[in-house]
Amino acid sequence: MQKARIKLSSTKHEELDSVCNQIKAIAEKTGVDMAGPIPLPTKSLKITTRKSTDGEGSSSFDRWTMRVHKRVIDIEADERTMKHIMKVRIPDAVQIEIELRS
């Protein structure tokens, strides 16, 4: 039986968790084995910019942070289950990658 590894990433963890819950419900409904969702470490991307563009005045800075949340789900990939997973509505903020393994 083939296995599928589903990798999900997003900057909005609420939407990411809702997609994970939908996939989990599909796996329970179809009765296939599933491992996950496994939370991976959150990446923090930081950018510091100077507020004053002309170089005059005091040195004050803005700090911008973006957090990227990731989840991994391993699931048995039978045809019926994969069709249901492909029909799940994925928000724009969530990126999904499906890798099939034998």
Swiss-Prot record:
The keyword Ribosomal protein applies. Keywords: Ribonucleoprotein, Ribosomal protein. GO terms for biological process: translation. SMART domains: Ribosomal_S10. It comes from the Archaea. GO terms for cellular component: small ribosomal subunit. Residues 37-61 are annotated as: Disordered. GO terms for molecular function: structural constituent of ribosome; tRNA binding. The keyword DNA repair does not apply. Part of the 30S ribosomal subunit. HAMAP family: Ribosomal_uS10. Involved in the binding of tRNA to the ribosomes. Belongs to the universal ribosomal protein uS10 family. NCBIfam families: uS10_euk_arch (TIGR01046). This is Small ribosomal subunit protein uS10. It comes from Methanococcus vannielii (strain ATCC 35089 / DSM 1224 / JCM 13029 / OCM 148 / SB).
